[in-house]
A protein has these predicted regions:
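Short, contiguous pre-domain boundary segments
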Residues: 3-15
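Acidic catalytic patch
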Residues: 111-129
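Short, contiguous alpha-helical
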Residues: 2-5, 20-31, 40-86, 125-189
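Active-site rim elements
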Residues: 13-20, 91-95, 140-144
Length: 189
């Protein structure tokens, strides 16, 4: 492996830090939606759905429970919070569970994106249904895009059911504010 110049090392460190900061804001987006969601939308029947489908409650439970699978399979040294029951969890329970699993996923990603030779997270195992990948930026991209996809579903479902979210504030698009809420001293870069 070729030695990296200081400039290359600094550039890679900046990219790593940006990915970690973005993931830190990921849960802030979920928390924002949970804080502004009308409680009547939590288990509301889905519009036009005849064969099941996930309620907003079930989608938030799915997000949390996927995080637990990633943690158990990729970072077994990290403690997992309890799973959420998609049929019984409350909004308050989901918010608390997401804070805990989000913090553990950030710890997992911090190790996975580390250049340290003794890192504990060397693989990303999503479950028995999928191939295992090397831990790294692709792991981050999968985790973030999975959650962004389901956030979009949640916002669309709420809107379709008449429970508009984030219509008076930039919400999930106001990343500078999310950065501050996540306690980050930097700004998106």
């Amino acid at each position: 492996m070729a030695l990296q110049s200081r400039g290359e090392h600094a550039a890679l460190a900046e990219i790593r830090d940006s990915l970690l900061e973005t993931y830190a804001c990921n849960d802030a987006m979920n928390q924002l939606i949970l804080s502004e969601l009308d409680p009547r939308a939590w288990r509301a029947p889905l519009p036009g759905e005849k064969r099941g489908g996930r309620t907003i409650a079930a989608i938030f439970a799915h997000l949390h429970n996927c995080r637990l699978s990633w943690l158990k399979n990729s970072a077994p040294h990290l403690k997992c919070p309890a799973a959420l029951d998609p049929d019984r969890c409350t909004m308050k329970q989901a918010a608390a569970a997401h804070r805990k699993s989000g913090a553990q996923c950030l710890r997992m990603l911090t190790d996975a994106l580390s250049a340290a030779p003794n890192r504990l997270v060397a693989k990303f195992a999503r479950g028995s249904w999928a191939q295992t990948w090397p831990a790294g930026a692709t792991m981050f991209a999968y985790m973030f895009s999975h959650e962004a996809h389901h956030r979009g579903q949640i916002l669309l479902l709420a809107h379709q059911m008449g429970y508009r979210l984030l219509h008076t504030t930039p919400g999930v698009w106001h990343w500078e504010k999310l950065w501050k809420q996540a306690g980050l001293a930097t700004r998106p870069h």
